[in-house]
Amino acid sequence: MNKQNLINQFAQLITEQPNPLSVNLDQMSALEIVQLMNKEDQQVPLVIAKALPEIAVVVEKIVAAFRQGGRLVYLGAGTSGRLGVLDASECPPTFGVNHEMVKGIIAGGEQAIRYPVEGAEDNQQAAIVDLQAIQLCSKDILVGIAASGRTPYVISGLKYAKEIGSFTVAIASNPQSAMAKIADIGIETIVGPEILTGSSRLKSGTAQKLVLNMLTTASMVLLGKCYQNLMVDVQASNEKLVDRATRIIMQATGCERAKAEQTLTQADNNAKLAILMILMDLDKQSAVDLLAKNQDKLRQTLD
């Protein structure tokens, strides 16, 4: 694409437009700046509400993929890539899943999580290399994330994923984006111009984070990774999480702390197992076997 075409393309992006409410940003007080930011941020959930039907469809696709041994893979550059890495990294401790189930890939690799990597988002071949490195396959779901909706790295990844039969999703903050036209489904979060012109780490980034929260949380809930509203598959790997697991057991069973602590120890810090052991008066192995017969779903096991 020649320079003039690029200029024209960028000029049409909502995320690159100036926000009329912040033209005097450099003359505002600290309070005025944060008040304006807060006012603008309040629009984000309202925008996402319009995309909930598409988000729910994607959640159902993710659950189906997980049940068939597939993975959820996020692909992005800069802020978008970092948010994907962040959401993926939170899944193992929160839901007790392995680190391969949800993966975040960022243009420029691990270094780009902390530092900008020049030209990384424009490297189309790198996206293919990165996806081949994790052996992306037709069972997986690829979610491309970019506020602009036209990041070359992400577009290349989406095209490659479609070629090999993966279900593809595009999350963008510009309407009718190039990414959305390629993907099987687009989630558009049109939050409007940022108060700091072009700084899509602000409202656009907030919108992306909220959508990613929904994708993984709703998917894991539907997989049986919670009971009531309790994260029963939490990995009790430090003092705070051991205490949380203990309180989860107490809430789910109504037992005293001493009983919860004792059973959690017997269950090797597995809160879900401990709850089942208490409610059905089972030993650990019997609880393990019963859960396995019920797809590891505590509600289904108890019913």
From Swiss-Prot:
InterPro entries in the record: Etherase_MurQ, Glucokinase_regulatory_CS, MURQ/GCKR, SIS_dom, SIS_dom_sf
Gene3D superfamilies membership: 1.10.8.1080, Glucose-6-phosphate isomerase like protein, domain 1
Entry annotation: catalytic residues: E90, E121
Enzyme class: lyase
Pathway: Amino-sugar metabolism; 1,6-anhydro-N-acetylmuramate degradation; Amino-sugar metabolism; N-acetylmuramate degradation; Cell wall biogenesis; peptidoglycan recycling
Subunit description: Homodimer.
Family: Belongs to the GCKR-like family. MurNAc-6-P etherase subfamily.
NCBIfam families the record matches: N-acetylmuramic acid 6-phosphate etherase (TIGR00274), PRK05441.1 (NF003915), PRK12570.1 (NF009222)
Name under which the protein is recorded: N-acetylmuramic acid 6-phosphate etherase
Source species taxonomy: Bacteria, Pseudomonadati, Pseudomonadota, Gammaproteobacteria, Pasteurellales
